[in-house]
Curated annotation (Swiss-Prot):
One of the GO BP terms on file: response to symbiotic bacterium
Mutation effect (S45D): Phosphomimetic mutant leading to a reduced oxygen consumption and to the delivery of oxygen O(2) to symbiosomes
Disulphide bond pairs: none
Residues where heme b binds: S45, K64, H93, K96
GO MF term (any one): heme binding
Subcellular location: Cytoplasm, Cytosol; Nucleus
Tissue and organ distribution: Specifically and strongly expressed in root nodules and at low levels in seedlings.
Induction statement: Accumulates in developing root nodules upon inoculation with the symbiotic M.loti strain MAFF303099.
Protein name listed in UniProt: Leghemoglobin 1
Pfam family for this entry, one: Globin
GO cellular component assignments: cytosol; host bacteroid-containing symbiosome; nucleus
Length: 146
């Protein structure tokens, strides 16, 4: 069974909820990442000097990660696979020494952040939709890394 229109709609509507409180959701996202993988702090230039704070760079990067996952959902619905529009993403992830476990940490933080953003609208279906979309994005990035 492929990615469904309902899953795409769930990701789209919850992405809009995420963006409504971008500053706080961005801080939450990176706080969750650093709780699981403190060493990841050095992978993000905007986190090196301090922890997650309300900074334009942090917000822009969080919006990019969530936006790429949103785009992955649309691609999965349209063509059943994810291709990267930015060919440089693989190289950046190689340069930062991103490994498989890092993708799992980001996925967990992403899901918890979406859950916080949507509140009582959180459901297993919503979790699955975001999880599948993120897995598609992660697979495309890993492919570009090799």
């Amino acid at each position: 069974m492929g990615f469904t229109a309902q899953q795409d709609a769930l990701v789209g509507s919850s992405y809009e909820a995420f963006k409504q409180n971008l500053p706080s959701n961005s801080v939450l996202f990176y706080t969750l990442i650093l709780e699981k993988a403190p060493a990841a702090k050095d992978m993000f230039s905007f986190l090196k000097a301090s922890g997650p704070t309300h900074s334009p760079q942090l917000q822009a990067h969080a919006e990019k990660v969530f936006g790429l996952t949103r785009d992955a959902a649309a691609q999965l619905l349209a063509k059943g696979e994810v291709t990267l529009a930015d060919a440089g993403l693989g190289a950046v992830h190689v340069q930062k020494a991103v490994a498989d476990p890092h993708f799992a940490v980001v996925k967990e933080a992403l899901l918890k952040t979406v859950q916080a953003a949507v509140g009582d609208k959180w459901s297993e279906d919503l979790s699955t939709a975001w999880g599948v979309a993120y897995d598609g994005l992660a697979a495309a990035i890993k492919k570009a890394m090799s």
